[in-house]
Amino acid sequence: MSSSFLSSTAFFLLLCLGFCHVSSSSSDQGTYIVHMAKSQMPSSFDLHSNWYDSSLRSISDSAELLYTYENAIHGFSTRLTQEEADSLMTQPGVISVLPEHRYELHTTRTPLFLGLDEHTADLFPEAGSYSDVVVGVLDTGVWPESKSYSDEGFGPIPSSWKGGCEAGTNFTASLCNRKLIGARFFARGYESTMGPIDESKESRSPRDDDGHGTHTSSTAAGSVVEGASLLGYASGTARGMAPRARVAVYKVCWLGGCFSSDILAAIDKAIADNVNVLSMSLGGGMSDYYRDGVAIGAFAAMERGILVSCSAGNAGPSSSSLSNVAPWITTVGAGTLDRDFPALAILGNGKNFTGVSLFKGEALPDKLLPFIYAGNASNATNGNLCMTGTLIPEKVKGKIVMCDRGINARVQKGDVVKAAGGVGMILANTAANGEELVADAHLLPATTVGEKAGDIIRHYVTTDPNPTASISILGTVVGVKPSPVVAAFSSRGPNSITPNILKPDLIAPGVNILAAWTGAAGPTGLASDSRRVEFNIISGTSMSCPHVSGLAALLKSVHPEWSPAAIRSALMTTAYKTYKDGKPLLDIATGKPSTPFDHGAGHVSPTTATNPGLIYDLTTEDYLGFLCALNYTSPQIRSVSRRNYTCDPSKSYSVADLNYPSFAVNVDGVGAYKYTRTVTSVGGAGTYSVKVTSETTGVKISVEPAVLNFKEANEKKSYTVTFTVDSSKPSGSNSFGSIEWSDGKHVVGSPVAISWT
């Protein structure tokens, strides 16, 4: 996932690929998360932690509690053998014993692109000075010295805040302020599996030695910083989406990954600390919700009124590649900005190709230089990829080298070329990345070109008897069209866990994003990169997620009474799916119009989300009904919800009737498929009429009633959508459409995805 934007650090290379069970260094033990039925604690215990410890002692003399959980789940984590875990499962009050899982990270112009600028206070008057809304970020920590955490102009820390600032290696509590009001770190689960943290390589504290966490938290809620840029690129004023909101960081990711026991502990603390929004740019694979630590923790946060925003993943453009698909999570894909960093690949045959680059340094001589394909400068089978140790110095010295994208980090390829004596690099996309161009702060003159240009350049360099080339770096341009387009790396639907829930929910800027950076690493994150920068430009759904987190904080400041579902609804139903000329958003991976499986409800539009007209709200009871519709057992529901809940055998539960702002219809034969929704007026009195669009004539979409008349604010109205299928299509076929309600002032849109199973 993160390999789609790996330009920064070796950290990403060490992360587990996918949602994987963590293997211990010991063949006997692993970390387990134990869910307990809190209400079943025997009266002989005065504290739940004592009960947990006693239960553990009954099956092991040596096992110790790593964490006890009170908010995210009821239970604890510990190290056990498989036999001990099986034995613990038989103890009274134990609901489940789940193995630790490891997650991966999904990793100035943006506010203007989204319509947020110095006039933001006109749209969000309650957030114009400073806000008491707190954005919690689970990531790699924070670089507190960054200007993005300046508390100038901020009032006192909110009285509702219950969090703290933890000291540790290279970090003191005094580094927090009225902006950065909380900082914690969680490493017990990580260290129990990976061993003690090597403090010569990373700080055992909230300090961010990687950069990812500083980038995401400042994207969500960084203070206004004038004169921001990366090496002169993207210069301007940097600001987070909610620059007057408070920030609390929870460091859960380390060099070896992000572990579910630590993530749950961080969510547990964040709930107790009273954050309002949780931003998590991490994930991995797909798993049933009762086995997914992020989904379980997010459910508890949702119950406390905390919106949870998560990255969709960087495994696109493959279908069904999403992470974080629980319906109580806002799942965010990535799109581009209207800003680019062009750099020309100039060939000796007179042809030029535009790529992208963030290189800053001594330019190449103003002449054509010898040019070689990496595959012809190596004896290794993967020499074309410019991996460490594969290039023959005698063949590349003094030359520009063409490398193919894949396997190792883009910037690492340039480092390999430079180490072998090459003077420049042309990096070519392959079919996996198509025409998507992600800019990097290379260590030598370099440009990245798309697949089509790469094919032409490769043919030239491998067939011309004396190929030559040069590279010209052109700086920053804005106003690029079309924009946005869906990023190729952005993970796609359909949702393989619950196909009747359309995911991702929406997209936000996630390509070439400028935000604050750590002072402990260069912009590439490579050990050979001695440069230090205050801001960096990187890409991934890791970057799009905090955009939505920050926008949710803005909406929370304006509408403090709104639930997480209401805030998500406002963001989704006001998202746009077309450009200003009416043409549909494009998918860079195909060059064709994107679909709801690519962009969800569309691209976020904060200027309209403040007044959506109608919202689709959801309660905890609705989500419990959803779990019943999945045929979850009572213990499985309890693992997710921390409560003893029994589905009503006399009630018919349907995933299709979850009050979600989108429609995913799975067709299994001809017939009628009915979906019910309830909308709440937040725009006052008004009469809304429905408009239905559909790509296919094989499915008739009808809405009853077709008109909703609201007499006052907060009034609720229900409607039923019937999808009548009168023709079959091959399994795997998809068709798309939309359902829109409008009163002439508001347009409340919902995407429709129809899939034949």
Curated annotation (Swiss-Prot):
It is an enzyme of class 3 (hydrolase). Its EC number is 3.4.21.-. Residues 25-106 form a propeptide. Pfam families: fn3_6 (PF17766), Inhibitor_I9 (PF05922), PA (PF02225), Peptidase_S8 (PF00082). Induction: By methyl jasmonate. Its main location: secreted. The active site is at D139 (charge relay system), H212 (charge relay system), S542 (charge relay system). Residues 196-219 are annotated as: Disordered. This is Subtilisin-like protease SBT1.7. Expressed in immature siliques and at lower levels in stems and flowers. Widely expressed at low levels. Activated by calcium. Inhibited by the serine protease inhibitors 4-(2-aminoethyl)benzenesulphonyl fluoride (AEBSF), PMSF, di-isopropyl phosphofluoridate (DFP) and soybean trypsin inhibitor (SBTI). Not inhibited by benzamidine or iodoacetamide. Leupeptin and pepstatin A have a minor inhibitory action. The keyword Secreted applies. Glycans are attached at N170, N352, N376, N379, N631, N644. Residues 102-610 form the Peptidase S8 domain. GO terms for molecular function: serine-type endopeptidase activity. PANTHER family: PROPROTEIN CONVERTASE SUBTILISIN/KEXIN. The gene is SBT1.7. Optimum temperature is 80 degrees Celsius. Thermostable. Residues 31-106 form the Inhibitor I9 domain. Residues 1-24 form the signal peptide. It is found in: Secreted, Cell wall.
